[in-house]
Amino acid sequence: MAVAVAAAGVLMGSEPGPAEELAKLEYLSLVSKVCTELDNHLGINDKDLAEFVISLAEKNTTFDTFKASLVKNGAEFTDSLISNLLRLIQTMRPPAKPSTSKDPVVKPKTEKEKLRELFPVLCQPDNPSARTMLDEEDVKVAVDVLKELEALMPSAAGQEKQRDPEHRDRTKKKKRSRSRDRDRDRDRDRDRDRDRDRDRDKDRERDRDRERDRERDRERDHKRRHRSRSRSHSRTRERTKGKSRYRSRSRSQSPFKDRKDREKYGERNLDRWRDKHVDRPPPEEPAIGDIYNGKVTSIMQFGCFVQLEGLRKRWEGLVHISELRREGRVANVADVVSKGQRVKVKVLSFTGTKTSLSMKDVDQETGEDLNPNRRRNLVGETNEETSMRNPDRPTHLSLVSAPEVEDDSLERKRLTRISDPEKWEIKQMIAANVLSKEEFPDFDEETGILPKVDDEEDEDLEIELVEEEPPFLRGHTKQSMDMSPIKIVKNPDGSLSQAAMMQSALAKERRELKQAQREAEMDSIPMGLNKHWVDPLPDAEGRQIAANMRGIGMMPNDIPEWKKHAFGGNKASYGKKTQMSILEQRESLPIYKLKEQLVQAVHDNQILIVIGETGSGKTTQITQYLAEAGYTSRGKIGCTQPRRVAAMSVAKRVSEEFGCCLGQEVGYTIRFEDCTSPETVIKYMTDGMLLRECLIDPDLTQYAIIMLDEAHERTIHTDVLFGLLKKTVQKRQDMKLIVTSATLDAVKFSQYFYEAPIFTIPGRTYPVEILYTKEPETDYLDASLITVMQIHLTEPPGDILVFLTGQEEIDTACEILYERMKSLGPDVPELIILPVYSALPSEMQTRIFDPAPPGSRKVVIATNIAETSLTIDGIYYVVDPGFVKQKVYNSKTGIDQLVVTPISQAQAKQRAGRAGRTGPGKCYRLYTERAYRDEMLTTNVPEIQRTNLASTVLSLKAMGINDLLSFDFMDAPPMETLITAMEQLYTLGALDDEGLLTRLGRRMAEFPLEPMLCKMLIMSVHLGCSEEMLTIVSMLSVQNVFYRPKDKQALADQKKAKFHQTEGDHLTLLAVYNSWKNNKFSNPWCYENFIQARSLRRAQDIRKQMLGIMDRHKLDVVSCGKSTVRVQKAICSGFFRNAAKKDPQEGYRTLIDQQVVYIHPSSALFNRQPEWVVYHELVLTTKEYMREVTTIDPRWLVEFAPAFFKVSDPTKLSKQKKQQRLEPLYNRYEEPNAWRISRAFRRR
């Protein structure tokens, strides 16, 4: 109103034109908005100050200059406030009118400026100090604690130091040297301290008991000495003591309140104290004797219920009418408190979830404890009860803030409840006016009869998604704006897309047919034979019959015949055979002739783009040439690979050529495995590992040359490395960057890297004839097999290469092709069928390099791995159906899915080129020329534009890169994907309300895991189950723990069932690892129980590395013992997005999108079907199956993900119930829909 009046006054006085009036109104609106921002952040609402800030922003249009001018004028604004003010002023300030012309010249905004206005959260200023912020905070906390310790030294020592100034100076010097020694020796002492933890914990318990006795004696002496003092003076002293205790509890920076705490922790354990207390979330349960703020939620005749604040979960307690106030008896509770009133209460006791509180012992104004003796008695009784309840509990668990969840369920079961018949009787008596409603046990004066708190687990709890957007994303999420899906297909209605959908349907039909055949075979087994199999002492005849019948359909001859024929049985030899020495092999590579030119090009240019076909020797030779040229004298030579198998195999080969042991001068680093040493000069690694090194050392100071190999694959890590290394080479002029690619799209790389020169390695290429189909093919798998048979029967000698999408498709094609060739008879020339996919053992993959025997032909059926990663000699014919399986992010479900999509034109050219390596060849494209031209993208969509970016955004934020819009991506990811990633990180607690990284987020970025696994592992530290969670995370990181051979499926299932846990699959994996550990990591034990020994050993290595990371960050590894509820809570805290509830009709429904899913048949919970579960991942076979499932309590979802879930309003119908269909009970006399009202009217 004031703004409007002021504006009106300005307009009346000067009588300007309409445009000027509008401009003044806009200016007044801007001033008001700036005043509001200043008031919100600083508590200053000054119009003159707002106008001064606006004038500064008009003169300084960039963030840096604006910030500098504010600092120069004495302003102490945060970066986020400065950014918001500048954006606000530049958006709302009316444009100045030029004096020379009537119409202002508006400069068109660039695309990036429009995006900055539309998504301000993605262009926050970078924070280069974010990498070291965590360490600085740790040091600051340690310094504050040391100051506290020094301030709490006895006063006598202080007086003595005052008398002796020289002694004080000497002490200061000693302190400085002692602090330096402490910093220097802390790492060395940490291992020694960990070994002494158990003994020290026992000593602490003894010291605690002695200290308690001493304190009682001191109190007795204190009373005896001061008995003569006046009562008013003692009351004042007690009040002061209570105030200081209350203040110290609310202050997070005062760790040691008295001498007992100082003796308990000591100086050497300051770091441990910091991580346990400063990093720890609010406690889950109230502590007896402590004082809490609370709010009155309901009023009863016998007292009131108060909800406690400052706890991790919702916790209510009862203040009995006798505990309301000290003065006199209370007749009516409503006279003392009212609903919604803020009060201060002391916790007297709690049993299960029933908590007894007191208001009369607390000063409601200051929070002072008016009866501290009662507090000591309560705590003493609790300690005695706890020690008597569980004497075998490890003492070191007392240092961890973990709830006693194992006792909750037991205590809750002991509570006496009113049975249903008793409730019915009471209701009938109320209806007959024998009892009044007020006497009903569950009566509430304001809301009427409600269910009791104790009946929570019996009632059907409804959980809903929180519809509120994160504060920094308001107006930008999918709730408030339509997000366009990622476009990975050029024409969704074209013939290629239709063929992909048709093939998916056919594959599903084939799977269902095989499953039906297996079920029919199992059903053919007569009933009642299982008792002979299970009986430990059966008669011989019955046992034999049972064994024979159980083996039906599972005999060794059930293994596909084509596999026996393809791999040649036990006599097969693996590996590419050659008669040349290693030196001759190196000299035969195409790159050898260009060795000198290549080294010179690297010397002359800081960035070099190298183009060469697969097999030219780029990966193995360039690093050796540069090492021989002396570049290793300045640092290491690093080479990245997109796949971990490639990094390992290439490093092994280069070490053989280099003449050293693997891990010495030549080594490799992959996730969870480091095979390097201080002598390593050539280091191969996955691109993700180099990205993690950038997190620690952004300038990569230990490297002289970085080589990004296979850059054409454009993995998500490679694209991020492009932007990071582009900055690094500008800072480090002595560093060299080499980017290699097997495709011919080098111009794009060159333009991105400052017009870097291109070095081309000429390869052996021959002309390739390309043939298209006349009509689109609906079943490309069948068309591929027909084409292979036609080539084999009609074309001249030469091997065939077929491209398919995945393992299942390849196995099916091999089986069908083998049967068809077998049906042609023995007169047809032999066709050797060889599959290639990543899950196949590497020694079997190498069989494709063996030449076919005379008079026969081999056909290699492979995934897109054969496009660029493999070079197979002798290929003259290529069959290209035109499809590939890609990982695509589904924004609806929030997960990545493998989807069959058409290839790009660049991939089609690459596949055709495979036929021209040995001689002139042919490429059979099983799609039309029009489809190639109109339905295929020019290049394939980079992974960064079609996958989930939560992990990438977390890494960039940890590096201090907050301005994601200004980050130099080669192909920028969609804004919608970045917004979704930040929303996910916010719900995990990794981002705060301003979109900046939290302390938890920095911890998460330190682990080489997915964000959900990181959250799960870090929360397990606070829940006191990190020992178990380390094992579970390690087991989840490996694949195929259980082995199920087709000839012993029943026995394998029986052995696996021994490890099944009622809580779910995560704890089943934990049981497997612990059993292996208890059997001394035995390989025979693995074979006996059908468990992959190699997978368990890999899990063991992963666990060791994760343990090292936790130790480095001082995160305690604590076991929860038999309290598996803690493990379930930790799993729920990380994977709450993957929660599902049992559906009344079929399977389960996910909470996030109501998708129908099912528990996988191999799960430990398959036959249990619990009400609520969380899953690790979804797998699409015949149905959408949940893998690695664990049961949960729905209340945990609200407890650990309050930003994502909430309890639905019980007075309204939830969304989930609205979607449910009403199914009437079966009635043989009526049709199913006869109960509907519409049918009743129709009958009339």
From Swiss-Prot:
Enzyme Commission code(s) on record: 3.6.4.13
What positions does the entry give for ATP binding?
Answer: 612-619
Question: Where are the compositionally biased (Basic and acidic residues) regions?
Answer: 160-169, 180-220, 256-283, 386-395
Modified residue Phosphoserine is at which positions?
419, 484
Q: Outline the extent of the S1 motif domain.
A: 289-360
Q: Which Pfam families match?
A: DEAD, HA2_C, HA2_N, Helicase_C, OB_NTP_bind, S1
Q: Where is the composition biased (Basic residues)?
A: 170-179, 221-234
Catalyses: ATP + H2O = ADP + phosphate + H(+)
Annotated Gene Ontology cellular components are: cytosol; nuclear body; nucleus; U2-type catalytic step 2 spliceosome
Task: Determine if Nucleus is one of this entry's keywords.
Answer: yes
Give UniProt keywords alphabetically.
ATP-binding, Helicase, Hydrolase, Isopeptide bond, mRNA processing, mRNA splicing, Nucleotide-binding, Nucleus, Phosphoprotein, Spliceosome, Ubl conjugation
Where does it localize?
A: Nucleus
Known partners and oligomeric status: Identified in the spliceosome C complex. Interacts with ARRB2; the interaction is detected in the nucleus upon OR1D2 stimulation. Interacts with SRRM2. Interacts with CACTIN.
Q: What is known of its domains?
A: The RS domain confers a nuclear localization signal, and appears to facilitate the interaction with the spliceosome.
Q: Which family does it belong to?
A: Belongs to the DEAD box helicase family. DEAH subfamily. DDX8/PRP22 sub-subfamily.
Identification of the protein by name:
ATP-dependent RNA helicase DHX8
What is the name of the gene encoding this protein?
Dhx8
